[in-house]
Amino acid sequence: MARLMGVDLPREKRMEIALTYIYGIGRTRSKEILEATGVSPDLRSKDLSDDDLTKLRDYIEASEFKVEGDLRREVQADIRRKIEIGCYQGLRHRRGLPVRGQRTKTNARTRKGPKKTVAGKKK
């Protein structure tokens, strides 16, 4: 099994898709990486040679973009900073509500968690 940046790449997927399993790499960046390293996007990750794997690893580490742990730490630090300075987005993060202006009268169940039933008015 091919292991890259601390992530096990799925064996049966094409490299173009398999690279997207690394946090911080999407389809566009995956194509860019494969083009720069000369690895075929149609190659399955199980058929990847050690030389190809080394080329991919070196290119990702040498590139300016952050992936995996570094990117996760940066995102968490940004959220922590917003909470500390007390901006609106920080307050929304602290309360566990949607941050980007979505409605909350209905929906937002993923962010708010399961419904808390409130007793109805008795007649």
Curated annotation (Swiss-Prot):
Gene Ontology BP terms: translation
Organism annotation: Nocardia farcinica (strain IFM 10152)
Highest classification ranks of the organism: Bacteria, Bacillati, Actinomycetota, Actinomycetes, Mycobacteriales
Transmembrane segments: none
Gene: rpsM
PROSITE patterns (alphabetical): RIBOSOMAL_S13_1 (PS00646), RIBOSOMAL_S13_2 (PS50159)
Keyword terms of this UniProt record: Ribonucleoprotein, Ribosomal protein, RNA-binding, rRNA-binding, tRNA-binding
Molecular function in Gene Ontology: rRNA binding; structural constituent of ribosome; tRNA binding
Function: Located at the top of the head of the 30S subunit, it contacts several helices of the 16S rRNA. In the 70S ribosome it contacts the 23S rRNA (bridge B1a) and protein L5 of the 50S subunit (bridge B1b), connecting the 2 subunits; these bridges are implicated in subunit movement. Contacts the tRNAs in the A and P-sites.
Assigned protein family: Belongs to the universal ribosomal protein uS13 family.
Region of interest (Disordered), ranges: 96-123
Protein name: Small ribosomal subunit protein uS13
GO CC terms of this entry: cytosol; small ribosomal subunit
Subunit structure: Part of the 30S ribosomal subunit. Forms a loose heterodimer with protein S19. Forms two bridges to the 50S subunit in the 70S ribosome.
